[in-house]
Amino acid sequence: MEITGTILRGPDLEPVEGRVIVDDGRIERIEEATTESTDIVCPAFVNAHTHIGDSIAKEAGGGLSLEELVAPPDGLKHRLLRQASREDLVDAMRRSLAFMHRSGTAACIDFREGDVAGVEMLREAADGLAVDAVAMARGSIDAMHAGDGFGASGANDDVFDEERAATREAGKPFGIHAGEGDASDLDPALELEPEFLVHVVHPEPRHLERIEAEEIPVVVCPRSNLVTDVGVPPVEDLVERTTVALGTDNVMLNSPSMFREMEFLAKLSDVPAREILRMATVNGADLAGADYGPIEPGRPARMVVLDGDSDNLAGARDPIRAVVRRAGVDDVREVVSSA
C-alpha cells in the first residue's frame, strides 16, 4: 500500500511531502518526493479518556452539576446505566466506537463502569471494529483482572489502596480522576502513585511540582470541564511539566470527536497546534501502551488521511493548524488500520 500527500512524520509531526509505504500492516518506509496529492496524512488519534457506557443518554442532564451528573453511585449517569438493558448498552457503545473509527480514532482509554460485566460489554461492543478499546475497569479487583487496568472515580469517593496494590501486582496501569471539581482529592490521588491522572483542573503549585518531579502524565478533557462548569485546566502549565494527552470524557456530554476536542482546546488556550496534535496522537498512544503513534518506519500503520482539497481544507497554508483547528470527520478520506 502506498499513501501520498503531506505526511506529518515522526514524534515531532514534521510535515514532509512524499509517500508512506505500508507492507503487511506496518510502515516500511517514508519517501520524500514531489507528489500531486493534496492529502494530509496524520497519525491516528487516541482518545485518552472516555466513558462510552453513557452513550445511551446523550444530552441527558442539562443544567445538572458535576456531582448530580456523574458522582457514584446515584448520579444521573449511574441511574441510567442501571436502568438500561445489556443489549441497549452494548449497541450504544458500539455505535460510539464506530463513530470514533470513522473520525480517525485508533484507540480509546475507557473508564469502564459495571464491574466485570462492564468490561465484557466493552469487549463485545468493540469486537470486529478497528478501535482498541482499553478497559480501565472499576468496581472490583476482579474487574481489573478482566480488563486492562483500573480507572478510579476519585480519591474522595472511596479508598483505593487495595485496588492500587492489586493493579501494580498485575502489572497493569492505574488511573484516577483528580482535581476536577476542586483540589481536595489531588493529594490522596498522588499518594496512590498512579500511572496517570485525569482532569487536573485545580492543581496548586505543589501539585504541579509533584506531577513534574514524579513524571505523572495527565489527560485533560476541556470540553467536559466547561460543560460541567468546573473550570478550565491549566493546560499550558501542565504541558511545561509533563506528558499531556487529550480525551473527550462522557459521551452523554460530548461527542467522542478528537477533531472537536482539538479545535476547542486550540481556541481556548495558547497551547501551540503542534503540541495539541501531539496530545491527541503520540502522547495518547504512549499512555495506551500502543505500538503505533508516530508515523515512522517499523510502526503499525494506524493513520488518518484527510482530503486537503475538501471545501473545508482547500487553501490551508499550515497542515498542522488545519488538522487541529479546522478539520472534521467530513474531511476524512481514509482511515488506515493495521488492526
State the predicted function of each range.
Residues 85-99, 136-143, 181-186:
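Short, acidic/polar
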Residues 191-192, 234-312:
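His/Asp/Glu-enriched, well-ordered alpha-helical/loop segment
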Residues 8, 300-339:
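C-terminal cap of metal-dependent C-N hydrolases
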Residues 141-234, 239-252, 271:
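Active-site core of metal-dependent hydrolases
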Residues 40, 56-128:
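Alpha-helical scaffold segments that flank or form the walls of functional sites
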Residues 32-64:
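N-terminal cap/recognition module
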Residues 5-6, 20, 25, 49, ...:
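Divalent metal-coordination and catalytic microenvironments
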Residues 1-34:
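N-terminal metal-binding scaffold of metallo-dependent hydrolase/deaminase domains
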